[in-house]
Amino acid sequence: QQIIQAIQSTSLPIVNSSFTPAEVGLSDIQLIDLFESQVMSRHLDFQSRVMQKQGQSFYTIGSAGHEGNAACALAFRPNDMAFLHYRSAAFVIQRSKQVPDQTILYDMLLSFAASSDDPISGGRHKVLGSKSLFIPPQTSTIASHLPKAVGTAFSISLSRKVAVDNVLEKDGVVMCNFGDASSNHSTAQGAFN
């Protein structure tokens, strides 16, 4: 409601950046597409709460405040491995647009409902992940994905040195994001070291 009121009254925040979308490599279409992914992420949060009130959803920790992750998804290739914080729905949505035949909104709703048809967890837990999107499943256990990201990044450089097949590109990048609570966790500290 607040965003609609702000747009209608044109009382939007003052932009402190002198860069235009074109100057950072974004077309108008890409900018609108990113915004759409962010809105979809936010509406999934709303829908999860509606489903929870109806007794149809069992996980309502949303991705509000993390919508900017959609831009990260656009910055990386869809086959760069991404180890995601459990609030990174906007990233998953944006990446799904880069890979044909994805049903990510439906899949995420199945996850919220703990449906056995959920393609990533089979109804065991709300999980962000997708094999076709190169996003290993990650639950809300904080920082547990950081060592996996380090190992995956190491495997890319190692695959260039030894004759071994790797599903990741030789010039691949491993992306990992996490929340502030993770940064003080011993698992994260081990990954940093």
Question: Could you describe each region identified by the protein language model?
Answer:
Residues Q1-N69, A75-F76:
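Conserved acidic/glycine
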Residues H43-F46, K53-N193:
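Cofactor-binding active-site loop characterized by glycine-rich and histidine/acidic residues
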